[in-house]
Structures are given as C-alpha cells and as structure tokens.
Amino acid sequence: VGTISDGSGCFNINSLVIFKDGNFIENPKSIAAYSKLLELMEVDNNLINESADQIIDWIDRDTLQRANGLEDYYYTGPLHNPREYSGMRLLISIDELKSIPAVRGINWNIYEDNFCALPIASNISININTLDQNDTYLLASIFPNIDLNDAAYIIDNIPKDGFDNFDNFSRTFPELDFESPNGNIDYKSKVFNTKIDIYHEDFQSSSQSIIMYENNKNGFIVARIYNGI
C-alpha cells in the first residue's frame, strides 16, 4: 500500500537555521514565524524564546551558548539522562525535539500537528494551493499582519485551479496585508512525502521517504526511514 502527499504543508523546524561559513546560524525570519505560531497557540513567551535558542544550539556546530540555549555541557552533565552530545546537524525527525528541555514544557501536539523535519536549512516554503483549514496557524505564522481569521478566510477562498503567482494571490485579497513575509509562498509542490506499507502473512514493514522535485523535472530522495526490515 503506498501513499504520496505534499511535504511542504508543515513548518520545517530546520528552517530555524541557515548554513553559512561552515556552521548553522540563526535564520531571523524563520525564528519570527516560529515565535508567532507558538504565540497563536498561547505558549508562554519564555518557553518560545528558550525552545528556539535550544533548538538552534542543538543544531549548530559551535559550543557558544545562545541567550536561552544549551550546549554539550548540559547534555553530557548529570542533569540530563541519557547523557549525550548535541546533534550538530539538521534534525532528521521532529521526535528528536523531545531531547530539548524547553520543548518538553510545550504541548507536544503542537509540534506533532504543525511541524516537520525536512533536510533543508532555508526559509519556510509552503504551497498555498494544498493548504486546508488545519493549516491556519502555519499560514498565519508566515505573515506578520495576518491573523487566524484572515488565514482561514484565505484558505477557504483558494480557487479550484489554485493560484499561479503572488500577484494573482495578493489581488484576490486586496484588503489583507502581505508585507514583509517570514517565509515563501509556492504555487507548486516541490517536496513530497511517500509512505509504503508491506504486509505478507505475519510480516509487516514500512518505509517513509522525502522526495524533492527540482525545476529541471528531476526528483531525488533526500531522506528515507525504514521500519520492520
């Protein structure tokens, strides 16, 4: 049994960083979008700041602690079980966030329902044409001047054939302010999730893959997870 779905309809947690000069450094736009999404979810502001800094410290390759961050001294110390080193790489799965102390203070359903871990360190990018009413928080997080009601209105009025460019999109909602976005709006899917389940008598196995589709019409697998093989 196989399924394929748009892989961009989520907040890529790895977008909190960009890669520059051999290190992962903060991405201010994505941090702003992350903060707004959690604010809309009524998460305490201290937890928002702590979780953002601690996630970035987990990913980056240096040992310099951010204002609200944590580095290896904490993860290898007696207060952390099991003792481990920070990842120093992009996250493979959002489940890795469970190692982050500040994240454990936030309702896990928020991450499970809205976030993903794509192996991409760049601004958030979502396909507006594949969003549904479960994605209002995601859409509102990208635009500083769009609230949840605005986001729901936009999604409810996506035309059957979709939008094909930003001018077409923005002209449809002239009363809304799309200035200074903290992410990118796409009009075609470039990232896909595939899941394959195999059943044979008492045997069961599955695989999940992330496939990226480039402008040259070539696709390639950027991540794959197996279970039961």
Give the residues covered by each predicted segment.
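Compositionally biased linear targeting/interaction segments
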Residues: 1-229
